[in-house]
Every structure is written in structure tokens, then in C-alpha cells.
Amino acid sequence: MSKTVFTYQNVLRAYYNCRKRKRRTLSALGFECNLEANLAHLTQALQTRTYVPDRSVYFVVTKPKPREIFAAEFLDRITHHILINEVEKIWEKQIFLPHSCACRKRKGHHYAMRYLSQQIKNFAYFGQFDITNFFSSIDKDILYSLFCQVIQTQHRPSWWKDDILWLSQVIIFTDPTKGYFY
């Protein structure tokens, strides 16, 4: 068998990461009813590159203000975690600003407050922005091109780069607003 990022062990690790906050959702419970077969099927679909993301779940939240949410199904979240597990360290070292705190390990509210309390003693500016439809307005071609540039510069085997670029392309170019369900 050829080398691949999409091993059963990596899929299982991504599953455990994914279920930390989603374990009680209907999608996660359904997935766990036939866990081993579902993990094996996902592993095979990724290895043969036949994986296709499922439809998104659509709902509206009202706090802090009304907004539409298109959430990935549990199985698709596992694939997101596979990708994150592989590229997170690269992003941490090369891409993210040191004072960006959103969705980063060891950079939660406490880190942000400590950083802000240190910086407030100097002349500092701070901004919190909520851009309407931010994620849906990102140019996916540009995003994927930037992603490719970063991955191609890594000192990793070509099979790793091929797997990561294929999965990132599938995820980036999936439109969650098409074929969603309530």
C-alpha cells in the first residue's frame, strides 16, 4: 500500500478530536452507532479520493445578532480535523499573527486578556470586526492558491502534499449553501 495521510489511525484521531464538542449531536450519535464501519468507510473514501462532503445543516442564531449558519455534518467535520491536524503547526509558525487569538490552541480568552493588559500600557489600537457574510465572500480561488503555496514550500514527501492539497481543495470548494437541509 502506498503512503498516505489518510490512515485509519489518523481518521480515528480526527474523530476523537471532532467528538469533543459534538458528541451529543444527532449527527455524531448516528455516526457512532456504526463507528468502526463508518471510520473504515471514510478512510477508504479518502484513500481512493471518492470522498464527497455531505449537505450542510442550515439554522439561524439570534444572539448576539441574527445570522444564518451552514454547519458541516459530523463526518465532514472529521475530514476538517484530519486537515487541521496536518497543517496546524505550519499555520502556527508561518501564517498566524502572534496576537491573533481566535480558534487557536493555548490562545483563548485568558491569553487575549493578558496580551491586551500588557499592550494597553503602550499606545495601542484594537479592533473587533463582524463582516457580514465574511466566509462566503472569500475568493476561494485565491484562498486555495495561497494554501497551495504554503504546502508546496514544506519539506514533506510528495504523497503528503498531494493528499493535503486534494483534501483542502475538496473542503475549500464545497459550497455549504447548495443543497443544505434544515
Tell me the role of every PLM-derived stretch.
Residues M1, Y8, I84-K140:
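Active-site-proximal segment of RNA-dependent polymerases
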Residues I78-I84:
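Active/ligand-binding-proximal structured segments within catalytic/core domains
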Residues V5-R21, P53-Y58, N85-W91, K121, ...:
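Short, compositionally biased low-complexity segments
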Residues V11, L42-K65, I78, I120, ...:
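Reverse-transcriptase-like RNA-dependent polymerase core
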Residues K20, R24, A37, H41-V52, ...:
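Short helix-loop boundary/capping segments at the starts of domains
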Residues R21-L29, D54-I78, I95-R106, I172-Y182:
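Short, conserved non-catalytic motifs in the polymerase core
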Residues M1-A40:
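Non-catalytic, polymerase-adjacent accessory regions of viral genome-replication enzymes
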Residues A45, Q118-Y182:
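Conserved polymerase palm-domain catalytic core
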